[in-house]
Amino acid sequence: MALNIENIIAEIKEASILELNDLVKAIEEEFGVTAAAPVAAAAAGGAEEAAKDSFDVELTSAGDKKVGVIKAVREITGLGLKEAKGLVDGAPANVKEGVAAAEAEEIKAKLEEAGATITLK
C-alpha cells in the first residue's frame, strides 16, 4: 500500500497547477466535501475568543421535505442539482462558511422554511 501512496505523491508533484485544481474539484464533487472547510475551521479556532462576526451555516438535517431543502440549497449556494443533493444527503454539512451574522440568519430562515434543521457555528 505504501508503494501506491508514493506513486500518487509522485504524480501530484509532476502535475501542473491547472491539473491539481481539476483534481481538487473532482474530489470535492465525488465525495461531497469542500477543500475550504478545514482551512476555515483552523482559522476560526484561534479567533474564538474575539467577538464572533462570521458564521458557518451547517445543515444538520434535511427533515421530511428533502426536495424543498435541495432547491433552497441550490438557490443559496449556486450549486448544481447533483452537488446540492450530495450536500443535503451528506448532512450534517456546511452550506456556507464565513458569512456575516445577518446573512447567516437569512440563510437559516430560508432553509428552516424549506424544512431543514440548521445550526450556526
Swiss-Prot record:
Forms part of the ribosomal stalk which helps the ribosome interact with GTP-bound translation factors. Is thus essential for accurate translation. This is Large ribosomal subunit protein bL12. The lineage of its organism: Bacteria, Bacillati, Bacillota, Bacilli, Lactobacillales. Belongs to the bacterial ribosomal protein bL12 family. Disulfide bonds: none annotated. CDD domains: Ribosomal_L7_L12. One of its GO terms (cellular component) is cytosolic large ribosomal subunit. Homodimer. Part of the ribosomal stalk of the 50S ribosomal subunit. Forms a multimeric L10(L12)X complex, where L10 forms an elongated spine to which 2 to 4 L12 dimers bind in a sequential fashion. Binds GTP-bound translation factors. One of its GO terms (molecular function) is structural constituent of ribosome. Keywords: Ribonucleoprotein, Ribosomal protein. HAMAP family: Ribosomal_bL12 (MF_00368). InterPro entries: Ribosomal_bL12, Ribosomal_bL12_C, Ribosomal_bL12_C/ClpS-like, Ribosomal_bL12_oligo, Ribosomal_bL12_oligo_N_sf. Pfam families: Ribosomal_L12 (PF00542), Ribosomal_L12_N (PF16320). One of its GO terms (biological process) is translation.
